Amino acid sequence: EIFGFDSDMEWDWGLPWYRPTRILHAVIGGEYGWRSGSGKFPSYYADTLPAAADIGLGSPTGVKFGTKSNFPEKYKNALFAMDWSYGRIFAVHLQPDGATYQGTPEVFVKGKPLNVADMDFGKDGAMYFITGGRGTQSGLYRVTYDGEKMKEPKKSDSELVAEKKKKKARE
């Protein structure tokens, strides 16, 4: 699966063809209607795919799934999307919808200024992100989960048998 955070055209804001920043699920043969100015295809055209989620005004800098985080399950399954200009990191909660997804964005981190430039999850399960760009002060931030420790999922019988075989092979 491929997801992206598509930018808007700021100078189109307030015009009938303005399209907000949006989360896209890229599918084979998908048409997302990117055109310049008033030539943009609206998402209701039969051959144009809609966004998984509309975000609004912003300046997208990237996306990352929370699968490597130590966050609760809700956020492990979320797509995190960074907005440089408004200083936000969204957690987009995706639900299957036919061959694609529909997403519900939630502001996960917000600050002023917080010009988010990049993000990753460390081996410790924390979210690390950096700020900076265009001559602004850079920074490195760490977001951790400070709640009840997550329980390890129970292993299937086949996983337990495979582990036992590996252990015997090492002995």
Give the location of each predicted region:
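Beta-propeller domains with acidic blade repeats across secreted/periplasmic ectodomains
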Residues: 1-171
